[in-house]
Design a protein with these regions (language model features):
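N-terminal beta-rich core of secreted/periplasmic extracellular enzymes
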Residues: 2-110
Length: 111
């Protein structure tokens, strides 16, 4: 069990009653340099190694993860990260779905 699930529940950055600026200052003050750098990264998750991306690299966003891995990504953030910062999960609809074997690619106009 990590600090996230036990000790961060009542910290200022998790309190929606406080002003946003105060919550941000509190969270940034708790983050390590590695966590701050990681939060600025968006990495390809097709490898399936979500623990490495989320826990070791502290990524703020992942691309191209399998829909079946989404619950695992959320659970990894909640159970294995120090501060429980939510993860942004995205996919590139114009050509990103073509990364998956057998995916249907529909034509799309780009103006």
């Amino acid at each position: 069990m990590t600090e996230t699930t036990e000790n961060t529940v009542n910290l200022p950055y998790r309190n929606p009653e406080l002003p946003t600026e105060e919550r941000i200052a509190d969270l940034l003050g708790r983050m390590t340099l590695e966590e701050k750098v990681g939060q600025m990264m968006q990495l390809d998750a097709r490898s399936g190694d979500l623990d490495d991306l989320i826990v070791n690299k502290h990524v703020g966003s992942i691309l191209h993860t399998s829909p079946s891995d989404l619950p695992k990504a959320v659970e990894t953030v909640n159970a294995k990260t120090r501060l429980g910062i939510p993860l942004v999960i995205g996919d590139d609809c114009i050509h990103g779905y073509s990364f998956w074997p057998g995916a249907t690619i529909f034509l799309s106009l780009i103006h």
